Regions:
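Contiguous, well-folded functional domains in the mature portion of proteins
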Residues: 1-176
Length: 176
């Protein structure tokens, strides 16, 4: 009996080690969903973004009219107009806004490629938008990404750069 217990314990240890090799570390690299020029959050006219009310934010003036998934995540919510999305990553949320003057936008400005509840992979196309039509109604057009974490999570530090492309790592999140 003693020998069987030792064998069971040994097998359980090896199984545990094996499973830990594939365990999610909890750290997710968040890539830029946009290709464009960085606008620090304190320079954005929208006061909730500039004061980081919803979480740590970063503005980007896009040079391309498409938005890609910044990481593996789930689409939790899409705004009625289609200019904003709430993405779930572990216990954190990413809020992506294509412009902040949503009351001026029309649904036809945005072409969605995803639906609520959909699981996304990193780099998957979320949407495209008509940048010319948006600039006509919103001269201060800027896109934002906001990281909203639970109370126990730490402050998010974004990359210090002037320009980002779709493969630029904006920040790393611990989402466990």
């Amino acid at each position: 009996m003693n020998r069987q217990k030792k064998l069971v314990i040994l097998v359980l240890r090896y199984v545990s080690i094996f499973l830990n090799l594939f365990k999610d570390s909890g750290y997710h690299k968040i890539l830029s969903p946009f290709d464009g020029n960085i606008v620090p959050s304190d320079m954005i006219a929208e006061s909730n973004i500039s004061r980081d009310v919803f979480g740590n934010s970063l503005g980007i003036q896009p040079v391309e009219n498409k938005v890609l998934s910044p990481c593996a995540c789930i689409v939790e919510r899409i705004s009625p107009v289609g200019n904003a999305m709430l993405l779930k990553v572990g216990n954190a949320h990413l809020i992506i806004n294509i412009g902040l003057e949503f009351e001026k936008y029309k649904k036809e400005f945005f072409k969605l490629n995803v639906v609520e509840g959909q699981r996304l992979s990193k780099g998957q196309k979320l949407m495209s938008f008509d940048i010319e039509k948006i600039y006509k109604v919103d001269t201060n057009f800027v896109c934002t990404i906001t990281v909203k974490q639970n109370r126990t999570s730490r402050h998010v530090s974004f990359i210090n750069a002037k320009h980002v492309s779709f493969d630029t790592i904006l920040c790393t999140l611990n989402v466990l």
